[in-house]
């Protein structure tokens, strides 16, 4: 059903505007940070996934501190930094909208 497509797109743009105007609330950042750290840990919990991660590092030309820096970045990012990144990289004028499903009239 397409009735939610336009409201959904508008809500995405509203969230982008909000990120431009105000820093992410600390409670929300903490929730996302915990989720990301948990996902990072889960992706390295088996010998095979850890081997895959090291293969990724080797084939991408990254150094052996890549994982440590990633964890540090997630732990240390501030609401102000996220706002600055949103202002720099989330430009509504350059976004492309892709909609899957029934053709809109």
Describe the residue ranges of each PLM region.
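C-terminal regions of mature proteins
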Residues: 19, 27-105
